[in-house]
């Protein structure tokens, strides 16, 4: 998709995004009011709304504010927010659809906000269940992303070679940037080294469009340089390995030609990773990569 098409799509989706935020807030108000009449006051709604909007607009503020460390903080918050928002919408919309189409809900006949004050207390239970579900799934998602999984897949290639076989570690989509940490990179390196592989291949998207998003890049490169294998570590570029401004996953037209930040290449050299750019290499006179 071209940059102009991304821009048009972003402009089209912006009001839809705002409507979704209003929809979520209305249900949050309804649930709070069902919990206690005291929560119907502005003393509750104003701070809750301000806090919610802080998260809701964090993709935009993180995009516009470039001064560190606030920029980095907002980008981290916005990334977590966008991931959590998917589950918020999924569960609330599912709950609302079931409420409207089944005739068996205790509060089926109620419509927010016109009948807000007549909503029964059962909304406390159902709303609490939905909120708990959102929190559990979101927390699981964060913890799941921090784990390193190893999957072993035997692959047979019908070609002659002087080698009886190769044990290759294939990793991809490191997305080194706002939400990556040195400890996580270290965990990946330690996991690779524990497998005693012959070759390490990195299948693109080492970076996340912004070299400056990496905290302490020299240290991260040092950690990656600790990868151990018989024939070395090789990589190829991915679509995120270019310098490009992104807002909530959308790229925007730029006056200058999009180029790859030279620091990406320097980083890989520092990390001992060989980048293959539309090329093959003969390794140890035994096989081609």
What are the residue ranges of the model-derived segments?
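Soluble catalytic domains of enzymes that build or remodel membrane lipids, polysaccharides, and related
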Residues: 151, 156-289
